[in-house]
Amino acid sequence: HRNMVAGAKSVSTYLGNHSSDTLLAALPLSFDAGFSQLTTAFHSGARVVLLNYLLPRDVLKAMEREKVTGLTAVPPLYIQLSALEWPAAIGEHLRYFANTGGRMPRETLAALRARVPKAKPFLMYGLTEAFRSTYLPPEEVDRRPDSIGKAIPNAEILVLREDGSECGPDEPGELVHRGALVGQGYWNDPEKTAERYKLL
């Protein structure tokens, strides 16, 4: 479970979470990003609101009612949320919104930023096996909207050739994540573990 603790430290570092935050856990807790809302809140002393919603409008109602300062969600939910009118009160409290689980469509990102212009967008990339790998800092979003960003704290991200050597700039290769955030393998499945995990 050390990688979950390392993940909570990493996420709370780059999102700047603190004890006065209120995070909304709208994603399933069985999904690493959903569970991460709990561990990040526990690590930073923040308040976390669990939400089992039926409609996207329920998410907005909870954000307004609970004065949510941080929201992490996946593109399908953000697409639905971006089509709705947001209560103005959400923008008074929401400090950031973070995307995970797939690429955020540019038009969705633009719509969200128009609804909550003071909230910082954090675009994240990662694998379930390795928690998160990278994030694009908010100040880079306009300049490099399609970038996966830089390594999160406690992660080392490399681009390697087939022989295991590091690629040069603009050279294609395999994206490799190593460090404290990477799981040790698949439970009771040494064959799959050997297939996907490599010692570097």
Where are these predicted regions, by residue range?
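Gly/Ser/Thr-rich phosphate-binding loop
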Residues: 43, 68-73, 78, 82-144, ...
